[in-house]
């Protein structure tokens, strides 16, 4: 083992946060210094040149002054016996750089602890706990101990459970020790199956496989159970009531209840992808259907939030990719419900500390870490995250089960999304006998063991070690490679080699492989030692049942194996043939190492007629008093509700997630010139050549279930509809729903409540509306139990139904946002009015509202959907208005009620509101804070009569009220008649609304950046995003050259982990280039030669997952490979070529500066000042330079998509910065909304000196930039754009310039 020192690992503010934690724990720590330590496992001694190459490879990241370490050494490393994602990616880079003697690289962090006195044993344990994550790391006290990272253990054998002599007791003991979560009747079933049918003892691996495959998590036993309620046998199971929605309204559903995701009818559009033979990008006109799936990952997120949420998103993405015979994930959502945050020094009046068990983390930690995990996976995979919700609830209430603490100690972590699939690929094919059964993706590791069974238990029912063992680890860059393989397969059309595919999720391959062959009506014979395995010491049970992520299983016919193998090699996606499909429905697993057969059983024992569950439930009704108003004052109520996290601004959850990748995002969360996160729904374009698209929205009103189960379920459906109504869908039958049910099954009253809620939507509301629920998920163990000081405690979740609505969109340009408009920012607007559509019909019920929660109350009667026909009329009326362009702004009424709706619209519009609520009743508190369904729309007064007439025609006349007007002011004034009810300054309210996001950012990110962003929100003079162009955006200067028919050749270059290549190809294609897909593996293997191309673009993403520095690993694979280096150097020297590097490609090309003429002053790009991935829509100004891309654009100011974690320009010193400025190579700078270059965050999202974000060479042929012009080349893909732009956005001009430059 060779040990190499790395760069410092922690910035000053990260060190300060650790020291603060030490002070809180009263540890005598006076200083901390941390640096990376690298460990190389070599197969032979490295020569001097190889050592030099390795040292250069491991020099990356920000240049921080080195520190000669002193103090106590605590070395954190990945757990011995595991291989971290960092290790696998950095080892890949080393091999691609020719360092073949390196078997493996690994990285640790060396902490040097200075202390005022020696640490006691207990203090040392506490210190280690804050320095490492016990889920995946260990702590050593010397470097030599790290050799354990490369130790190889001997394989462990399987064990038998002796039922033949030990009987039922032996199985009961195994149930506990292995954490199988078997029910009593399942124990009986297994006992009978093995002792009477098979007449042998089971192996531990067979029992674990059975437990995973038949867990509540995988088999949904409660939803398939027979029910008796209050002594009356019920006719239908829960699942049958859900399926009733499909029986009543099967319209537009192509696949339901049988695959990894549901499929609905999409649009016919031109899908843009490379031709499988020529690799040239083209449009392919075809039916492009819509995938939809929403998962939960609650249990792992409670134990370890980052990996729990990250693998939750990763698993849902795999579900979409594994639909039919290959789907394409497109846009995601992430949502959370947790208990009260109790932010330090910001604890709110309604937040009581009810305690928690030690095995789970706090709600605050979940929300500091979990969203980062979910965002990081989506970011690195390359899927925009466009939707979410965030609810906090934890209160002692008197509901149907009496007084108890209800809340989300077991959180909800929701991960979902939509994708696309070809018409001919919706249904899976037949598995041929003898087909190869394949595992595609990463290796087996001893992680995530028993996750399916563990998540099926109430939190606290299993041992703590089993809880920790059941959490997985993530490697999104590996999943991206696997998806590229799936993409290449479906792009082959009828020649798609995939016959059958499933993702690997709960239960690992022990669930996925049996499911694969069973669904394909086959059996399978497998060899355990063919499963790719990074931990040779694992037992057969651990190899077969672990939940290592980023894996798919599939069947490929022998005739298609050569095609499949070539695709995998090109994409560098590992795969293994682990078995063959058999005619006999038997499952056999052979182990060549021990020469035995750990599994040999008929499929019908594993997945056959296991005992059916029966639920006997009793109805309990809540009887709670109305809200006590005596302590509620209007202005204080306003402040409290705006601070409730469910209502408050969510920016800290949004800007961490890429919202522009694909270039197909038509509506993200951020709205208008001030980028306020209040969008009603998410919208994507179906293609680059049309305005058809897809939309998704969320609906949930879970606290209502504490008063009325059915109402909570109906409101969830209703809210999803009032949200998605903001876009142009048409017939309601184009909307399909996912229903995610979370319940504390078995808790008093909850089972009957669950049945009532499912019946309310499945048998009643959805059929009445014409809505179908073709997909969903259930999580039936939403309770946390623990013992504290000898007292039994529990926190029980409310029944929680989360509805996600998905829809085909006719025209994405017609999507309406909540941004109020005034004549000064919308030409020809004229006078406007605000209209409230109140589907509560004046009932104004306050039960289980945000208002009730912030006063620690529940109330009696909640909002409800009293009239399904009226809700349908609302949808149809709003759709008519949207289609006719008669709505200026739209916002649904939800958490916080009418007051919050009006406030959020004013925030988005940076304006005032003058409203009068006299028509809503005398009870102004109830009128403003009830959460009945509805919406507020802004309409032109010229259209007002027509709008009211349309609403009346849809049965909404009695509930539609003109309540006020929009004012070009900073005041929110609400009156009732002549009495002023609320008169508040908008900026002041906006600041209060932002406090939660500010506090959370300050705890999680660089607090200086958090403070700057919060201060900026107080600036009422901020003009918002604006545009100043030196050219006509609607002129196509490339058209004359395109008309000649000549198409210059453009190399669209990607490396493993790059994810922005398709939109880049689309931009160059539109400008008249012949865009060709080139993978770095094509260049390294000689399949592609750069000299054939006129232009080269290095695309954005996460090459090698950004290990060894963003873009640096990619660059070093060029620099350290002589033939590849020569090819790039020769290309850059050719005077008839041009090159562009964007984001990751910018970072990569900046590291090739020695090969690029005129780039000698280029800087490096390192970690953002905020130390956080930044996804922003930032204003930049084009500088005077010779860049071929920016010819004629000098002085133009326009917003652009920014998405990076390492975009800060790093210079050696001031002389270097001056040399850059004096060379005339600065091409782009960040500017504030007044047009001035800025260092202020977030206008300068990464802290780059002199606001530099784009550079060119002295001759202008090579340009690099961190922002993403390719994602916003269409107007519709801009989060905000001014009126008057046509199809092309302003950034299309730089691609047209490139074409014009060639002539």
Curated annotation (Swiss-Prot):
PROSITE patterns per the UniProt record, alphabetical: GATASE_TYPE_1
Catalytic activity: N(2)-formyl-N(1)-(5-phospho-beta-D-ribosyl)glycinamide + L-glutamine + ATP + H2O = 2-formamido-N(1)-(5-O-phospho-beta-D-ribosyl)acetamidine + L-glutamate + ADP + phosphate + H(+)
GO biological process, one term: 'de novo' IMP biosynthetic process
Record-stated family: In the N-terminal section; belongs to the FGAMS family.
Assembly and binders: Monomer.
Cellular localization per UniProt: Cytoplasm
Annotated positions binding Mg(2+): 719, 723, 892
The Glutamine amidotransferase type-1 domain, residue ranges: 1050-1303
Classification via Gene3D superfamilies: 3.40.50.880, Phosphoribosylformylglycinamidine synthase, linker domain (1.10.8.750), PurM-like C-terminal domain (3.90.650.10), PurM-like, N-terminal domain (3.30.1330.10)
CDD domains: GATase1_FGAR_AT, PurL_repeat1
Matches recorded under InterPro entries: Class_I_gatase-like, FGAR-AT_N, FGAR-AT_PurM_N-like, PurL_large, PurL_linker, PurM-like_C_dom, PurM-like_C_sf, PurM-like_N_sf
Example of a GO cellular component annotation carried by this entry: cytoplasm
Name of the protein in question: Phosphoribosylformylglycinamidine synthase
Physiological role: Phosphoribosylformylglycinamidine synthase involved in the purines biosynthetic pathway. Catalyzes the ATP-dependent conversion of formylglycinamide ribonucleotide (FGAR) and glutamine to yield formylglycinamidine ribonucleotide (FGAM) and glutamate.
Pathway: Purine metabolism; IMP biosynthesis via de novo pathway; 5-amino-1-(5-phospho-D-ribosyl)imidazole from N(2)-formyl-N(1)-(5-phospho-D-ribosyl)glycinamide: step 1/2
Gene, per the UniProt record: purL
Entry EC no(s): 6.3.5.3
């Amino acid at each position: 083992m060779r040990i190499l020192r790395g760069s410092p690992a922690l910035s000053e503010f990260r060190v300060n946060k650790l020291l603060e934690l030490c002070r809180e724990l009263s540890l005598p720590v006076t200083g901390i210094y941390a640096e990376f330590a690298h460990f190389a496992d070599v197969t032979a001694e490295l020569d001097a040149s190889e050592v030099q190459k390795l040292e250069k490879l491991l020099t990356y990241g920000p240049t921080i002054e080195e520190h000669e370490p002193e103090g106590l050494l605590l070395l954190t490393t990945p757990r011995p016996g595991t291989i971290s994602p960092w290790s696998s990616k950095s080892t890949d880079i080393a091999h691609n750089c020719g360092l073949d003697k390196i078997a493996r690289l690994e990285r640790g962090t060396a902490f040097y602890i200075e202390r005022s006195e020696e640490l006691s044993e207990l203090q040392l344990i506490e210190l280690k706990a804050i320095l490492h994550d016990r889920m995946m790391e260990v702590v050593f006290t010397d470097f030599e101990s790290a050799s354990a990272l490369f130790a190889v253990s001997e394989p462990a054998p399987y064990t038998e459970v002796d039922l033949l002599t030990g009987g039922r007791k032996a199985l009961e003991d195994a149930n506990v020790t292995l954490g199988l979560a078997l029910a009593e009747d399942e124990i009986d079933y297994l006992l009978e199956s093995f002792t009477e049918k098979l007449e042998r003892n089971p192996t531990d691996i067979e029992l674990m496989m059975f437990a995973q495959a038949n867990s509540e998590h995988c088999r949904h036993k409660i939803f398939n159970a027979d029910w008796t309620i209050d002594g009356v046998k019920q006719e239908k199971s829960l699942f049958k009531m859900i399926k009733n929605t499909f029986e009543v309204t099967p319209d537009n559903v192509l696949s339901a209840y049988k695959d990894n995701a549901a499929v609905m009818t999409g649009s016919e559009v031109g899908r843009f992808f490379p031709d499988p033979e020529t690799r040239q990008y083209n449009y392919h006109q075809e039916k492009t259907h819509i995938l939809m799936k929403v998962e939960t990952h609650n249990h792992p997120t409670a134990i370890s939030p980052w990996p729990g949420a990250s693998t939750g998103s990763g698993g849902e993405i795999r579900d979409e990719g594994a639909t039919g015979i290959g789907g394409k994930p497109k846009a995601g959502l992430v949502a959370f419900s947790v208990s009260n945050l109790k932010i330090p020094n910001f604890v709110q009046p309604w937040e009581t500390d009810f305690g928690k068990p030690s095995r789970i983390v706090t709600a605050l930690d979940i929300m500091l870490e979990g969203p980062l995990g979910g965002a990081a996976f989506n970011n690195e995979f390359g899927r925009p995250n466009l939707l979410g919700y965030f609810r906090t609830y934890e209160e002692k209430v008197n509901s149907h089960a009496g007084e108890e603490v209800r809340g989300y100690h077991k959180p909800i972590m929701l991960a979902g999304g939509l994708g696309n699939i070809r018409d001919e690929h919706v249904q899976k094919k037949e598995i041929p006998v003898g087909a190869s059964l394949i595992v595609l993706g990463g290796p087996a590791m001893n992680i995530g063991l028993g996750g399916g069974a563990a998540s099926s238990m109430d939190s606290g029912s299993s041992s703590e070690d089993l809880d920790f063992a059941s959490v997985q680890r993530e490697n999104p860059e590996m999943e991206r490679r696997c998806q590229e393989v799936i993409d290449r397969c479906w792009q082959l059309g009828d020649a798609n080699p995939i016959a059958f595919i499933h993702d690997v999720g709960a239960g690992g391959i022990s669930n996925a492989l049996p499911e694969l062959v069973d669904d394909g009506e086959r059996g399978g014979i497998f060899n355990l030692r063919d499963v790719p395995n990074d931990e040779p010491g694992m037992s057969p049970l651990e190899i077969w049942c672990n939940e290592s992520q980023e894996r798919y299983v599939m069947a490929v016919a022998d005739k298609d194996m050569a095609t499949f193998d070539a695709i995998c090699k090109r994409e560098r996606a590992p795969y293994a043939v682990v078995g063959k499909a058999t005619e006999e429905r038997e499952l056999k697993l052979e182990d060549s190492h021990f020469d035995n057969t750990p599994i040999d059983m008929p499929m019908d024992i594993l997945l056959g007629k296991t005992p059916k569950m029966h639920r006997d439930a009793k109805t309990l009704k809540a009887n709670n008093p109305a809200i006590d108003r005596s302590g509620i004052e209007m202005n204080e109520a306003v402040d409290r509700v705006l601070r409730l996290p469910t209502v408050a601004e969510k920016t800290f959850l949004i800007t961490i997630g890429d919202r522009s990748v694909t270039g197909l995002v038509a509506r993200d969360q951020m709205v208008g010139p001030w980028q306020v996160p209040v969008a009603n729904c998410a919208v994507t374009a179906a293609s680059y050549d049309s305005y058809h698209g897809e939309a998704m929205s969320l609906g949930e009103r879970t606290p209502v279930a504490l008063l009325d189960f059915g109402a909570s379920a109906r409101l969830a459906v209703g809210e999803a509809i009032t949200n998605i109504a903001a876009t142009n869908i048409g017939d309601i039958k184009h909307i399909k729903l996912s229903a995610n049910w979370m319940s504390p099954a078995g808790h008093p009253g909850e089972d009957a409540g669950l049945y009532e809620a499912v019946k309310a939507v499945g048998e009643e509301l959805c059929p009445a509306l014409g809505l179908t629920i073709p997909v969903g998920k259930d999580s039936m163990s939403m309770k946390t139990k623990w013992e504290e000081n000898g007292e039994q405690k529990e926190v029980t979740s409310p029944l929680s139904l989360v509805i996600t609505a998905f829809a085909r969109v006719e025209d994405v340009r017609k999507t309406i946002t909540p941004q109020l408009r005034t004549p000064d920012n919308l030409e020809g607007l004229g006078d406007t009015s605000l209209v409230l559509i109140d589907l509560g019909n004046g009932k104004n019920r306050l039960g289980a509202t945000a208002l009730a929660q912030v006063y620690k109350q529940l109330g009696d009667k909640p909002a409800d959907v009293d009239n399904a026909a009226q809700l349908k009329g609302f949808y149809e009326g709003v759709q008519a208005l949207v289609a006719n362009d008669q709505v200026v702004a739209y916002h649904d009424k939800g958490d916080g009620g009418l007051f919050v709706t009006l406030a959020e619209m004013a925030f988005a519009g940076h304006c005032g509101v003058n409203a009068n609520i006299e028509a809503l009743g005398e009870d102004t508190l109830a009128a403003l804070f009830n959460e009945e369904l509805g919406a507020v729309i802004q309409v032109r007064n010229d259209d007002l009569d027509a709008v009211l007439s349309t609403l009346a025609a849809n049965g909404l006349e009695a509930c539609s009220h003109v309540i006020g007007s929009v004012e070009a002011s900073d005041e929110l004034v609400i009156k009732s008649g002549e009495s002023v009810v609320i008169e508040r300054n908008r900026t002041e309210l906006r600041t209060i609304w932002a406090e939660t996001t500010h506090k959370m950012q300050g705890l999680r990110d660089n607090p200086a950046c958090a403070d700057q962003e919060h201060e900026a929100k107080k600036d009422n003079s901020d003009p918002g995003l604006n545009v100043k162009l030196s050219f006509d955006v609607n002129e196509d200067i490339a058209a004359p050259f395109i008309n000649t028919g000549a198409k210059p050749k453009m190399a669209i270059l990607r490396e493993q982990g790059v994810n922005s290549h398709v939109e880049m190809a689309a931009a160059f294609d539109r400008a008249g280039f012949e865009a060709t897909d080139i993978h770095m593996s094509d260049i390294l293997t000689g399949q592609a030669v750069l000299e054939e191309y006129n232009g080269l673009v290095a695309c954005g993403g996460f090459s090698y997952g950004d290990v060894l520095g963003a873009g640096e690993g990619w660059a070093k694979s060029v620099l350290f490979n002589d033939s590849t280096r020569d090819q790039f150097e020769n290309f850059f020297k050719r005077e008839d070529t041009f090159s562009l590097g964007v984001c990751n490609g910018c970072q990569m090309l900046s590291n090739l500066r020695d090969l690029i003429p005129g780039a000698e002053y280029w800087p490096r790009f390192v970690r953002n000042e905020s130390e956080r991935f930044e996804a922003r829509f930032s204003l930049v100004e084009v500088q005077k330079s010779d860049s071929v891309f920016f010819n004629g654009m000098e002085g133009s100011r326009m917003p652009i998509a920014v998405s990076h974690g390492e975009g800060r320009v790093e210079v050696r010193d001031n002389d270097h910065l001056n040399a850059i400025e004096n060379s005339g190579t600065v091409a782009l700078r960040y500017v504030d909304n007044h047009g001035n270059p800025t260092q202020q965050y977030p206008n300068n999202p990464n802290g780059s000196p002199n606001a530099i974000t784009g550079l060119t060479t002295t001759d202008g042929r090579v340009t690099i930039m961190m922002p993403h012009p390719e994602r916003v080349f269409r107007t519709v893909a801009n989060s905000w754009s001014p009126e008057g732009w046509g199809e092309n956005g302003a950034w299309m001009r730089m691609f047209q310039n490139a074409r014009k430059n060639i002539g």
